[in-house]
Amino acid sequence: MLWTDCLTRLRQELSDNVFAMWIRPLVAEEVEGILRLYAPNPYWTRYIQENHLELISILAEQLSEGRVRQVEILVDSRPGSILSSSEQPATTTAALQTAPIPQPAKVKREPEPVANTAVSSKSSKKKLLNPQFTFSLFVEGRSNQMAAETCRKVLTQLGASQHNPLFLYGPTGLGKTHLMQAVGNALLQAKPNARVMYMTSESFVQDFVSSLQKGKVEEFKKNCRSLDLLLVDDIHLLAGKEASLVEFFYTFNALLDESKQIILTSDRYPKELTELDPRLVSRFSWGLSVGVEPPDIETRIEILLKKAENSGVDLPRNCALFIAQQVVANVRELEGALNKVVAISRFKGAPIDLDVVRESLKDVLAIRARTISVENIQRVVSEYFRIPLKELIGPKRTRIYARPRQLAMGLARELTGDSFPEIGMAFGGRDHSTVMHACEKVVSLREEDPIFDEDYKNLLRLLQS
């Protein structure tokens, strides 16, 4: 039979998931040179038309030796057809059950409860965003200021084309989720009846597949496309989820057509998402893309102090400085370190001081001692600027050596627990005031000179990788 031969070839051409979920359940019949394929619902037919009909047509013509010159895909409403019943066909259900279905995302335990979705107060399914994710509780610094300001601006011009979609990108644990949910919380506070939905890309896939299994695709589409604000976390994780990507594409377009706001997050800039459909990636760039960088040491200190204050914890500033010097990767690790310090303090029944902090972070200190040292920083900086190590450490004050030297001292202060005198000794026996001046100079140069700031960020990434 022609369709059986087509199935054999399609199994070779397509992924196992796509074949099992979308192709195997189709019913086929050949009528006067036309191969008719029947699908359970309109969504199914649209997916086949836009993704696989051309391939099926080519195979049908080849395998029939020209007998079949046209392939049609229709919703099966034939009398007595199993596909015309209110239930999904047994073969469809079986196929979906054998295909790997994403499991519900495991929610990390945070000090405050976190929910997956926020919808309007009219909804019968009333779930809330994390109430702690607000603008007032977000600590701003040079690394995230533009992203925070943009998110606040979105609230005043919801759906405006210049920032729709708003695409926040950067490494994990830097506050992208906090910012996007802050927009949702602020909107719901101002307009309690606004329809807001927050989901991860995994939960989008899960809900979509579930709607297919239960025959509730139209309900899923209606829920997603009637929003005022859609927030989707980790959009890059939709890669490889072909059917879900198609549905997200249509949802995305429908919301943009209605000038409804979309905010997405990813670990990379849109054009670096090469594993996603280029059409979708192109649309991600229609609005505004804003990067979020790892926080500098001043911001890390303020994050720790605010977190401690909100938790009713007395954290001395010198202890916050010490923690911030040791934990540099992201906000999540920073908060984890603080939680450990608080736990040790309570266990010992002692106030938080440097001894308690050092004991709490001994594992972190041991790892950092093996990986980031002043000597390591000097080597990386000298290689980056292609200058001899002896000149970086030496006495010459010419600009070609002085700027990299100041930068290296600033990095040493930020990334190691060494004191100013210790850093000075590592740089040819310079005194502590020279190191202090270098660190202050680095702060001012980063604000004044974009090239210097970019060099600093590049070196920070190299040393932290």
UniProtKB/Swiss-Prot annotation:
Ranges for region Domain IV, binds dsDNA: 346-465
MF GO annotations: ATP binding; ATP hydrolysis activity; DNA replication origin binding; lipid binding
Locations listed in the record: Cytoplasm
Predominant location category: cytoplasm
Superkingdom of the source species: Bacteria
SMART domains with a match to the protein in the record: AAA, Bac_DnaA_C
Annotated region described as Domain III, AAA+ region, given as residue ranges: 128-345
Low complexity bias locations: 88-100
Region (Disordered): 81-123
GO biological process per UniProt: DNA replication initiation; regulation of DNA replication
Keyword annotations of the record: ATP-binding, Cytoplasm, DNA replication, DNA-binding, Lipid-binding, Nucleotide-binding
Gene Ontology annotations for the cellular component aspect, listed alphabetically: cytoplasm; plasma membrane
Ranges for region Domain II: 88-127
Keyword flag Secreted: no
Span list, region Domain I, interacts with DnaA modulators: 1-87
InterPro entries, sorted: AAA+_ATPase (IPR003593), Chromosome_initiator_DnaA (IPR001957), Chromosome_initiator_DnaA-like (IPR020591), Chromosome_initiator_DnaA_CS (IPR018312), DnaA_C (IPR013159), DnaA_dom (IPR013317), DnaA_N_dom (IPR024633), DnaA_N_sf (IPR038454)
Pfam families per record: Bac_DnaA, Bac_DnaA_C, DnaA_N
Comment on protein domains: Domain I is involved in oligomerization and binding regulators, domain II is flexibile and of varying length in different bacteria, domain III forms the AAA+ region, while domain IV binds dsDNA.
Subunit structure: Oligomerizes as a right-handed, spiral filament on DNA at oriC.
Function statement: Plays an essential role in the initiation and regulation of chromosomal replication. ATP-DnaA binds to the origin of replication (oriC) to initiate formation of the DNA replication initiation complex once per cell cycle. Binds the DnaA box (a 9 base pair repeat at the origin) and separates the double-stranded (ds)DNA. Forms a right-handed helical filament on oriC DNA; dsDNA binds to the exterior of the filament while single-stranded (ss)DNA is stabiized in the filament's interior.
Family: Belongs to the DnaA family.
Protein name stated in the entry: Chromosomal replication initiator protein DnaA
Organism of provenance: Acinetobacter baumannii (strain ATCC 17978 / DSM 105126 / CIP 53.77 / LMG 1025 / NCDC KC755 / 5377)
Lineage: Bacteria, Pseudomonadati, Pseudomonadota, Gammaproteobacteria, Moraxellales
